[in-house]
């Protein structure tokens, strides 16, 4: 495994440990060059409450690897979180920089009513 990936996973592990101590619902993000995924995971980590990604039927037709697609995923996860009764979450960026697509998703989720 490359040093860059190891460093990202180390950052992710530290952040998840801190979130686990809080025991709150977390918004976990995963990013690949082509797609972006978001999951709401319960405080104990046992269940996925809601999920959204660029692989969803409504989002799959357009471009999937850009900031506009990330905004759409952020709005969709916020909508599904509200439907599940979740308003407050901890943002788990999985060790990725808070920039670009990650930031676009987070901003759209905040606009949709999620509180970080």
UniProtKB/Swiss-Prot annotation:
Alphabetical list of CDD domains matching this protein: Ribosomal_L18_L5e (cd00432)
InterPro entries: Ribosomal_uL18_bac-type, Ribosomal_uL18_bac/euk
Gene3D superfamilies in the cross-refs: 3.30.420.100
GO CC entries: cytosolic large ribosomal subunit
Keywords assigned by UniProt, alphabetized: Ribonucleoprotein, Ribosomal protein, RNA-binding, rRNA-binding
GO BP, one annotated term: translation
Keyword Ribonucleoprotein: yes
Domain of life of the organism encoding this protein: Bacteria
Transmembrane segments: none
GO MF annotation terms: 5S rRNA binding; structural constituent of ribosome
Entries under SUPFAM superfamilies matching the protein: Translational machinery components
Subunit structure of this chain's protein: Part of the 50S ribosomal subunit; part of the 5S rRNA/L5/L18/L25 subcomplex. Contacts the 5S and 23S rRNAs.
Family: Belongs to the universal ribosomal protein uL18 family.
Function: This is one of the proteins that bind and probably mediate the attachment of the 5S RNA into the large ribosomal subunit, where it forms part of the central protuberance.
NCBIfam families named among the record's database cross-references: L18_bact
Protein name as annotated: Large ribosomal subunit protein uL18
Gene: rplR
């Amino acid at each position: 495994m490359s040093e860059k990936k190891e460093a990202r996973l180390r950052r992710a592990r530290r952040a998840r440990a801190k979130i686990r101590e809080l025991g709150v619902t977390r918004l976990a993000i995963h990013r690949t060059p082509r797609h972006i995924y978001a999951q709401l995971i319960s405080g104990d980590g046992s269940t996925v409450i809601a999920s959204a990604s660029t692989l969803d039927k409504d989002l799959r037709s357009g471009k999937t690897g850009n900031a506009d697609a990330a905004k759409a995923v952020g709005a969709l996860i916020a909508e599904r979180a509200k439907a599940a009764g979740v308003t407050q979450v901890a943002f788990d960026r999985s060790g990725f920089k808070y920039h670009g697509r990650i930031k676009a998703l987070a901003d759209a989720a905040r606009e949709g009513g999620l509180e970080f």
